[in-house]
Amino acid sequence: HPICIEIGAGKGKHALLFSAQNPQHNLIAIERTREKFLAMQKQHEIEGQTNLNPIHADALPWVVHALHPKQVQQFFILYPNPEPHNPAQRWLNMPFFEFLISRLDQHGTVTLASNIPEYIAEAEQQLINVWKLPFVKEVIPATSARTHFEVKYLERGELCQQLIISKPEGYITRF
C-alpha cells in the first residue's frame, strides 16, 4: 500500500475524509497539539478507518526517525502556520524540506495549501529558484471543506490556493 502523510492534521477532518475516500491508501496523520490530536483520535474511533494511523508527535523528528527514502507517495501540508515573524520556519524555506522530498517516491507529490497569497508566492519562488521542482498552482474551490481552517477561510470569501509539487524521476537529494 502506498503511504500518505499529513503533517499538522489538526482535528483530523481531512485525514478522516481522505482515508474514507481512498481505502487503497494508508494515511499517517501527524498532529503535535495534544488537544487536536485527541479530537482526531476520538473521531477516528467512531469512524474506524483501518487505513488511518493518527500520530501524536512533532512532525520533523518523527519524519526523520520513521520514514525511509522514497517511501511516501503523498505529503499533505494544509494551512500550515504561516510563521509571519519567522520566515526561516516556513516549510519551503527550511533545509528540512530537502529531507522531506528525499522521503517522497518518484512522481510523488506534496500538497501545500494556504489562504495567504504571499505565502504561496514565496513558496513558488523557492520551488523555482532553490528546489527546482515542478508544481501546479490551483485555486481551491469555494465548495471545498477539507479542514476546519479551510471551511472558515472560504466562508469569509478568502482566496485559498494550493501548490501540488511533484518529484520528477531522477531528482537527487543529499539524503
Task: Describe every region a protein language model picked out.
Residues 92-106:
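A short glycine-rich, Lys/Arg-flanked "PGG" loop and its adjoining helix->strand segment in the class I
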